Amino acid sequence: MLNLENKTYVIMGIANKRSIAFGVAKVLDQLGAKLVFTYRKERSRKELEKLLEQLNQPEAHLYQIDVQSDEEVINGFEQIGKDVGNIDGVYHSIAFANMEDLRGRFSETSREGFLLAQDISSYSLTIVAHEAKKLMPEGGSIVATTYLGGEFAVQNYNVMGVAKASLEANVKYLALDLGPDNIRVNAISASPIRTLSAKGVGGFNTILKEIEERAPLKRNVDQVEVGKTAAYLLSDLSSGVTGENIHVDSGFHAIK
């Protein structure tokens, strides 16, 4: 079994127990890693504190970081460095779009809504990578969560699909930029999972049913399966992998 006892990872984007990022946390925790968590609002901190009771972390390392604020990202990672020292990687699972920009016609997306989705869902990875790099002097790994809607036009995904396409390009350019620093940057394209964010996508149950019927594995995946792939990408087992987008979707991406 993979041993991550001497590794420290920052996990961003846990909203509740259904979050993909929490599935990642559970797997990394089982493998012995020290985990650091960020959250946006105070109510998220309270939820995180409850979830930590399910993990084996001896200490609660929780930091409030709103990725829309450069100052909070900069100060947050600086404080993480002071408290826990260097880190080995970051799991980024942050995305947001206004509900009306997911449910309406894509051509009616507002400028404000378009930029908001890009800012939170894509640009946040850029500034996070810049600050996390300072805590990875010997190299490390950054992994982001994406979805098939960034590669193909998916009904009702709208502005978030464009944001995910941006995120996936972001991953490639960060991989190129940070490669000389021995920092790898990859993405996991996860199958639709019943998370808080998924509630905003129209026809979500139809998508789940289609995957069960048409995907090679004839089933949907869960958060822990994404977590297992994240553990691989965050660990030295994937030392030669960067700029990659690995699909954890029962093979749905491979069929027409």
UniProtKB/Swiss-Prot annotation:
Kindly list any coiled-coil regions of this protein: none
The UniProt record gives the binding positions of NADP(+) as 13, 19-20, 40-44, 66-67, 94, 164, 193-197
Provide the effect of residue 41 to N.
Answer: Exhibits an 50-fold decrease in kcat/ Km for NADPH, whereas kcat/Km for NADH increases by 5-7-fold
Q: Name one GO biological process term.
A: fatty acid elongation
What does the record give as the organism's lineage?
Bacteria, Bacillati, Bacillota, Bacilli, Bacillales
- Please state what the protein is called: Enoyl-[acyl-carrier-protein] reductase [NADPH] FabI
Instruction: Report the catalytic activity.
Output: a 2,3-saturated acyl-[ACP] + NADP(+) = a (2E)-enoyl-[ACP] + NADPH + H(+)
**What organism does this protein naturally occur in?**
Staphylococcus aureus (strain NCTC 8325 / PS 47)
Annotated phenotype, changing residue 95 to V:
Exhibits an 240-fold decrease in kcat/ Km for NADPH, whereas kcat/Km for DD-ACP decreases only by 18-fold
Site Critical for cofactor specificity: which residues? 40-41
Name the consequence of residue 193 to S.
Exhibits an 13-fold decrease in kcat/ Km for NADPH, whereas kcat/Km for DD-ACP decreases only by 6-fold
Site annotation (Involved in acyl-ACP binding): which residues?
205
UniProt keywords, alphabetically:
Fatty acid biosynthesis, Fatty acid metabolism, Lipid biosynthesis, Lipid metabolism, NAD, NADP, Oxidoreductase
